[in-house]
Amino acid sequence: MSLWVDKYRPKSLNALSHNEELTNFLKSLSDQPRDLPHLLLYGPNGTGKKTRCMALLESIFGPGVYRLKIDVRQFVTASNRKLELNVVSSPYHLEITPSDMGNNDRIVIQELLKEVAQMEQVDFQDSKDGLAHRYKCVIINEANSLTKDAQAALRRTMEKYSKNIRLIMVCDSMSPIIAPIKSRCLLIRCPAPSDSEISTILSDVVTNERIQLETKDILKRIAQASNGNLRVSLLMLESMALNNELALKSSSPIIKPDWIIVIHKLTRKIVKERSVNSLIECRAVLYDLLAHCIPANIILKELTFSLLDVETLNTTNKSSIIEYSSVFDERLSLGNKAIFHLEGFIAKVMCCLD
């Protein structure tokens, strides 16, 4: 049994249900596979960047891109430290997240991509175009989290091995990406779906799952609460449906993700109790969030917006919070211990409010 967000994930370009203009553009790219450039897809979370990547590959290579396996690759640093990275692969592509290696992401770029790029692809018997395009695609998740050294290594790889490899980079923001990489890629923006588009998609899921719906207003409320994040809206719908035995009423409360509720509680603690003991309690909450694999930058972003929504704070306090958030967001990208910087942000905010 899979989550609805996976069960109803489109697997082809024709199955995509929103942003038709972008879908048609991707179809035009798949019509000329030999001329496929390096791609950089950017946009907010939950807008379907990864889904569109896989749909594009399916259009080029066929259904074989969904024959996935997970390998664990080992890398050795200059200090003889062994590191492991999960690599998702099919006969036609690889999917990696080098930022999981922290400041050692350059090693992944230099060794893994170089190894893949130096091997000419010949097993294309199941692809739609036979042997017409002998290259392998590499999807790089969280490209905006790559260090400058890794991006420099990536630039050299793109220049030297463009014949045998195509890079598809996925990121939330383009600002951390260096200019030489952006200039070598086709930039594709994936905008967030509108509330009406999300409501339409949720309505299709409701029909397929045979959920009893009192009124469609509940779907609009879910779409508004998701802030344009289609993934979150599907998870919220599934949680509400299971909690209410597949019967949703107009009075049914919107169930937000637990980690967001925890951050909102953390915000109230920061505003009401500004003390050393309170800071220690906040540290325990941060540890819990990080242990549940909530990215540190997402925690910082949600905490910042939650603090800005507090009505009792004046304009001076809010401007200081924004300034501190930008400072610690940069430090998160430079450091290895996220807990230090998140706790430092909370301490700064507490001092600001006193």
From Swiss-Prot:
The keyword DNA-binding applies. InterPro entries: AAA+_ATPase (IPR003593), DNA_pol3_clamp-load_cplx_C (IPR008921), DNA_Rep/Repair_Clamp_Loader (IPR050238), P-loop_NTPase (IPR027417). SMART domains: AAA (SM00382). Replication factor C (RFC) is a heteropentamer of subunits RFC1, RFC2, RFC3, RFC4 and RFC5 and forms a complex with POL30/PCNA in the presence of ATP. Component of the RAD24-RFC complex which consists of RAD24, RFC2, RFC3, RFC4 and RFC5 and associates with the checkpoint clamp DDC1:MEC3:RAD17 complex. Component of the ELG1-RFC complex which consists of ELG1, RFC2, RFC3, RFC4 and RFC5. Component of the CTF18-RFC complex, which consists of CTF18, CTF8, DCC1, RFC2, RFC3, RFC4 and RFC5. RFC5 interacts with ECO1. Keywords: ATP-binding, Cell cycle, DNA replication, DNA-binding, Nucleotide-binding, Nucleus. It comes from Saccharomyces cerevisiae (strain ATCC 204508 / S288c) (Baker's yeast). The keyword Transmembrane does not apply. This is Replication factor C subunit 5.
